[in-house]
Amino acid sequence: HLLVGLLYNIEYIAKSKGQAELSPLTHQNDIFQRLISLVNTYSKTERNVSFYANKLCLTPRYLNTVIRQTSQQTVMDWINQSIILEAKVLLKHSNRLVYQISDELNFPNPSFFSKFFKRMTGMTPQEYQKN
């Protein structure tokens, strides 16, 4: 799956940027890798940190702490990145219209999707699709 590969590349980049000190923290790295796997599987439908924390048998606060220590990003950042990567792939490599992509990614409406996409990328879905 393309999205899985992209997220693992992001993880690799995060680890290679001066985070060698994290290698002994195998439990934290394990939690991080399990979170990424869950985000890849469920981010289209589940955008609540509590969902992922429950799947990992952790509290949302502890999960966020571990993920922030491991990657300098929050769980929500990883969820949003996954959604944006999926949206970008669909916008560039499918013939779907924005409202169809919005539906596929389970946004309440195309307007909400467009605002989210613009907030995350700095451009509208239509602008991204054209470039």
What are these model-derived regions, one by one?
Residues K115-N131:
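…primarily DNA-binding HTH/wHTH and HhH modules…
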Residues E11-S37, T41-F51, K55, Q69-D77, ...:
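Short, Lys/Arg-enriched, Trp-marked, Pro/Gly-tolerant hinge/linker segments that flank
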Residues Q69-S111, K130-N131:
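Terminal helix-turn-helix DNA-binding modules in bacterial transcription factors
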Residues S50-F51, Y62, Q100:
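Alpha-helical residues within helix-turn-helix
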Residues L63-N64, F112-F113, F117:
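Short hydrophobic/aromatic patch on the recognition helix
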Residues H1-N9, Q81-L85:
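Short, residue-level hotspots on alpha-helical faces of the histone-fold
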Residues N54, L58-N64:
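Long amphipathic alpha-helical coiled-coil segments
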Residues L56, L105-N106, F117:
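Core residues of bacterial helix-turn-helix
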